[in-house]
From Swiss-Prot:
GO terms under biological process: translation
UniProt xrefs under PANTHER family: 50S RIBOSOMAL PROTEIN L33, CHLOROPLASTIC, LARGE RIBOSOMAL SUBUNIT PROTEIN BL33C
Name the UniProt record assigns to this protein: Large ribosomal subunit protein bL33c
GO molecular function: structural constituent of ribosome
Chloroplast recorded as keyword: yes
Gene3D superfamilies reported in the protein's UniProt record: Ribosomal protein L33 (2.20.28.120)
Presence of keyword Ribosomal protein: yes
Alphabetical UniProt keywords: Chloroplast, Plastid, Ribonucleoprotein, Ribosomal protein
Disulfide bonds: none
NCBIfam families: PRK00504.1, PRK00595.1, rpmG_bact
Listed InterPro entries: Ribosomal_bL33, Ribosomal_bL33_CS, Ribosomal_bL33_sf, Ribosomal_zn-bd
Protein's organism: Citrus sinensis (Sweet orange)
Highest taxon listed in the record's lineage: Eukaryota
Amino acid sequence: MAKGKEVRVRVILECTSCVRNGVNKESRGISRYITQKNRHNTPSRLELRKFCPYCYKHTLHGEIKK
């Protein structure tokens, strides 16, 4: 068998509302989650609704580049 790129890759999900609003004095930072995705099943960017401890609500977290 040919050895190519790994099918499962590690991705970092970042809160889109924290990034959009910018890190102001009220916000202490930007929420990030680390997870894995199957490159064959989801070739596009991954977006999940996760809890952001800085926004105090569930927001959309998008995949970022490493």
